[in-house]
Amino acid sequence: DLFICFTTILLYKARDSMLPCNESHPINPYVNDYVFSKHLSEEVIRFYKDSVPSIIMRCSNIYGPTRLVRPDLIPTLIQDSYSCDSVSVWNKKPQRDFIYLEDAADAIVSLIDTDYTGIVNLGTGATTSVGEISNIIEKLSGKKVVDLEKKVKGPMYFQCDTTLLYDLTGWKPKYTLDQGIEKTYKRMGVWKNENLWPNKVMTS
């Protein structure tokens, strides 16, 4: 048996440098309640590690048709582009690592097939700015995404190092950001037309 615990790369201590964070990078679990709860999950896993084989997957920003919770950036922009007259973002400069849901699932399956136990980062190993994502939404929706240019909370740049994941599995993402966002955008459009969106889907 193997237990998999999903936490977050937000555990890593923020820094101004553009170097990616590997699994040995120092953590800061006291950023907020969400991050601290993930830290507690990891501590429980460590306590039982000798009796329960486990993997701790520190996830980057996973997006896709079934990841529709606000205030996550991509689902929020898509929802607003369908239902609002104006679309805006807090600031277009921050860069984060975004991974499509199907790619994340493939990576998880690939890792299960190994004998590895311990911590591993889950992401694409590359960053994309909020501005670049806004441009994709503009092309799909025909609506301009306004930059409010407000002060950014948190680091401007956050990337996880996925070298360990690749070394263990050889896994690489199949979907580009454009492809993943387009698939998500179209699926949410179908749900909207079928009266399943936004209330029944976005709040689930």
Where in the sequence are the language-model features?
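C-terminal substrate-binding subdomain of Rossmann-fold SDR/epimerase-dehydratase oxidoreductases
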Residues: 81-204
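Conserved Rossmann-fold NAD(P)-dependent oxidoreductase catalytic core, especially the SDR/UDP-sugar
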Residues: 1-31
